[in-house]
């Protein structure tokens, strides 16, 4: 991968140690500790719409968040298989669905993006560090589209959240 393009505020590194604690994750490199972007954003104010949603769903919120995380992991795994050239279908050889229809739809949104923009895949699961922002993290994919470098983190939400741009 051409690392020079990423070095504006990010540096790609394979020389690091990931430290996962019960409520946070840090990356250690060259004697310096970087909090994960996800951990930093967990302290970012969620806003009025999130608060309204919590009031509306009440105790169900834990279940909803857990299911969304599980669904996101399933879609992420499907995308990785797709990027590795694996072929799979919604129906198995007996005509029975192999995937939940909502998970399949989320996966197809990625396929539509991939086919429409025709990116050149450079790397997956890239560990990035920013001395300027003092954070680190792992992006899902680095690719090139129309001669521009893209850092991609797969999302399965139906809405754009205010923290998405902060994660990049």
For every predicted segment, state its role.
Residues 122-168:
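Mg2+/Mn2+-dependent nuclease catalytic core
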Residues 1-136:
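Metal-dependent nuclease catalytic cores that hydrolyze phosphodiester bonds in DNA/RNA
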